[in-house]
Amino acid sequence: MGFKYIQKIPTPAQILQEMPMSANLKKTKVSRDKEILNVLKGKDKRLLLIIGPCSADNEDALCEYVSGLSALQSKVKDRLILIPRIYTNKPRTTGQGYKGMLHQPNASEGPNISQGIIAIRRMHL
């Protein structure tokens, strides 16, 4: 049994090279990771809230949503740490229908996993 390649998928190294995190974003991530770890270890009394849409399938809407969470985070930072949950697939029992951004970044076009990986990376930056 063999596989037929429909399209080549970029490697993680290629994606990271083409779409690296900025120095400022890296610094923010390290700081947030430390805050989260301190909550999990009981060293920080704030609550973690992991929140987000059931499924992220619109890049612009998701970026607007996360920007709103960021504004809210600044208001509740003494009590809460808000963590956006960004789930980019849509579970399907039968395997039929729209499967989410990973498989089909534009719901009105055909599947394109390569473009889906890029769209998801963009959203997570």
Regions found by a protein language model. Name each.
Residues 67-125:
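A generic, well-ordered mixed alpha/beta core segment in the N-terminal half of proteins
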Residues 28-46, 61-74:
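Generic N-terminal targeting/processing segments that precede catalytic cores or assembly contacts
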Residues 2-43:
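N- or domain-start disorder-to-order transition segments that initiate the globular core
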Residues 7, 21-28, 57, 61, ...:
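Catalytic cores of large soluble enzymes that bind and process phosphate-bearing ligands
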Residues 52:
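Conserved, mostly hydrophobic/aromatic
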